[in-house]
Amino acid sequence: MSVPHLVYVALGGALGAVSRYLIVAWVSNVAGAKFPWGTLAVNLLGSFLLGTAFVYVVEKLHGQPELRSLIMVGFLGALTTFSTFSLEAWSLMQSDQLLQGLAYILMSVILCLFAVSAGIALTRLIL
C-alpha cells in the first residue's frame, strides 16, 4: 500500500461520507424518519454504483489501482454503511417493530444484490 493509494482512499472516503450524509438527510426529509429509507437508499445506490465500477474499473481497465482505491474503496465504501444498517434493524426490532425490522433486513439484502447485479449488467451492456 503506497501513500498515493491512501490519499485516493481518503479523498474518495471524504466525498462518499459527505454524499451519504446529504442523501440520507434529503431522503429522510422527503420520506420521513420512522423507517430508515435514507440508509436503504444509499446502500442501494452504492450497490448499483459498485456494480458499474466493478465492470468499468476491474474488467475494462484491468483493475486500475488508483481508480479502485478512489472509487470502489474510498467513495463507495464511505457512501454505503453496513454498520448503520445493522443498528437501524436492531433498533426497529427492539422497539416492538419486529416485522419492520425483518422487512428492512430482507429489503436491504435482496434489493442491494439486485442493484449490484443491475449495475454490472447495465455497464456490460453499455461498454
Swiss-Prot record:
Gene Ontology BP term (one): cellular detoxification of fluoride
Localization: Cell inner membrane
Record flagged with keyword Metal-binding: yes
Binding-site residues, Na(+): 77, 80
Entry keywords, A to Z: Cell inner membrane, Cell membrane, Ion channel, Ion transport, Membrane, Metal-binding, Sodium, Transmembrane, Transmembrane helix, Transport
Principal subcellular localisation of the protein: membrane
Known catalytic reactions: fluoride(in) = fluoride(out)
Cysteine-cysteine disulfides: none
Keyword set includes Cytoplasm: no
Superkingdom, natural source: Bacteria
Modulation of this protein's activity: Na(+) is not transported, but it plays an essential structural role and its presence is essential for fluoride channel function.
Topology with respect to the bilayer: Multi-pass membrane protein
Pfam families named in the record: CRCB (PF02537)
Cellular component terms per the entry's GO annotation: plasma membrane
GO molecular function: fluoride channel activity; metal ion binding
Primary role: Fluoride-specific ion channel. Important for reducing fluoride concentration in the cell, thus reducing its toxicity.
Recorded family membership: Belongs to the fluoride channel Fluc/FEX (TC 1.A.43) family.
Protein name: Fluoride-specific ion channel FluC
Originating species: Hahella chejuensis (strain KCTC 2396)
